[in-house]
């Protein structure tokens, strides 16, 4: 047993175990111990839990705006609700339980609970409950619920479908229509704003003699089993919950009933699901030698990154995954910058699917640009079903006055578009997938370049183009000019567009130009911008100013001293009147993020100087920030500092270190971008993996806390396994059809033209 945190342990490096029940941790543990499969996320709650315990099943592609303000994914009726009464007394979880253990088995995506509790009649009741969301049947989540008594007693099990579920911003389903089938019940309802049909069907079987009586009321339907528990003889209830919507199939009820009819036993479905998880881990697992806590924390994060990612069709990865409705189940820049790299190097088809979502929603980006007076594609800061902007104008409240704060995430944070162009270019660079560029990528990059050209302001007195009234990754400083990260990303996009204009075959280029109406005058403008756009460069001290006027702001070091200026603990720190706005205190990596994306852009000395300048000015109040600093610290051989940030990042959810409410808005749930970044910290950070031009670069560093680590990466269709120990680095080409690859290991050029190459450290 290895201790992760208070009452939190692991046995094998594949399990998370909590051995104390704490009612106050319902939000956190509901997220941490959740199950999912990219189609749905079922929170890690218990069978008897309702909305007061934040029980919910969140389903992809069910966006709705029930309250007229927030468009978010719907929580669907819960078909696993099971209530136990023993001799008339309800079984209710107590912090005084005789024994309690809950486990998340990362290896196969199973969450479980085993609890023993003494009832008023003297019987000690033991419940063993486990659930999983099937990767074999992505519309199904299954539960096995076993109850045992140490003495003979009467019991009642109420099990069915709970319609009255937890939802952050209104009830999204209406007009619930009940129906039954041979092995259970079902319900069909419609979303409020889009009128999409959602069907939930349950199957139910009990392995004991019991009388059965159906029930139906406005809050749900199901059946009541009345039975006698014999001392020492367990009774098991097996349930499946099957979910379909009209966004998946034409007739959700028929499809759900058909799947229910062919559902196998819990153990058979669990075995099939285990095979699917074996395959998933063969792609994504990163092993750490001789540090089981870091190992399990890393796997915990990778697990949550996996289950948050839709793979059944092109849909976004939500900023809170499918753990809750916070951030609306929609994509931010996180998707391409923090989540996609793991897929890019481990399972490129998923990376392709992520980018296809951005192509599918290109019209939404065009609509946003046009609405705001621009051309081309200005991608939504918060993007859901259609790519239209979901980010409200008023995201936070001023907790001092109670008034809404007008934030400008949705109209000033323009870097979202060049970030997507960056992801397209990086995908092509790593995979060599020319077909994607022809069919999707070129159109996206050209439309983003078109947007940037329409946004840029030409300053005749300075003879240059500038990007004004923007907001960089540091969200506390809005309405700034020439944010260094934004301007660099814009130039990267224009360069990518220019390269495509020169390298695409004539037929493809003509077709894309005709499709989007791209003129020669526009192309000339792009090339003029390439030559004359202002890009902040290192000053005489080697520092890149984050934005115009940043140096004029008040210096507060360390940055967290700014918290002493708060009047109320939960007030918003940022624009327009937060305590950081007139200071150099920044929310998260901004200039430093530039070095994460472009590790070869500046020399090491420049990176070091900027790291040392910005790190003490960074609050790290975004879950995205520690991972960015970890990656860059590893690049410049601040290995132990990188390791400290690695630990901080991978423990954000496990140890619940980030706030659930900011500026009066609920932002709880799993931090999906930090989950994805956990993989990057090892592979791109400590491993130093990058692709620059046609070559692969590796510069592996090893924290003192580890004896070694191993990861896989797919580059140009070749699967590499990188094994790092204290003595050496071994790179093995695991591909069946091996091809020569040019490597740069610590800057020394090598050609991997055999099975493996070994270098001393």
Swiss-Prot record:
The keyword Transport does not apply. The keyword ATP-binding does not apply. The active site is at residue 475. Keywords: Glycosyltransferase, Metal-binding, Transferase. Substrate binds at residues 333-334, 587-588. Changing residue 572 to F: Impairs both phosphorylase and hydrolase activities. It catalyses: 2-O-(alpha-D-glucopyranosyl)glycerol + phosphate = beta-D-glucose 1-phosphate + glycerol. GO terms for biological process: carbohydrate metabolic process. Optimum pH is 6.0-8.0. Belongs to the glycosyl hydrolase 65 family. This is 1,2-alpha-glucosylglycerol phosphorylase. It comes from Bacillus selenitireducens (strain ATCC 700615 / DSM 15326 / MLS10).
